[in-house]
């Protein structure tokens, strides 16, 4: 049971943060975001909850694996910091509708996730590889945020 908790609790935390972020996004997603100029590479709206669900599971599994393997607390703290920065992006971009601060935040998030992957890879390759889909999605999101900032 304890081993199961190593994985379940981080996954639930990711979904809780994601649901909290969606609370602050809802009005902007339905009223403001559709009016913005977006690039042709913008995924359909239905892709976002699917992608984030997969990403949250992978993020939680990554931390769970680190905890189970007894990795140092620095990596867990880094995981937590990137989750907070991820949440802040939703506030900055959607709730405050500040495209510039959203872009700064997501660039910071890109860096934090890259650092996490590179540091975790040295200790636990599987845990690092679980973050790769998240990093790739973030790169797309960074492109989208940058485009929206430049053309709106």
Report each predicted region and the residues it spans.
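N-terminal signal-anchor transmembrane alpha helix
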Residues: 2-24
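Membrane-interface helix termini and inter-helical loops of multi-pass transporters
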Residues: 27-40, 150-152
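Non-cytosolic membrane-interface motifs at loop->transmembrane helix junctions
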Residues: 35-38, 99-108, 130
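Membrane-helix boundary connector in multi-pass membrane proteins
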Residues: 93-99, 115-128
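Terminal transmembrane helical module of multi-pass membrane proteins
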Residues: 125-152
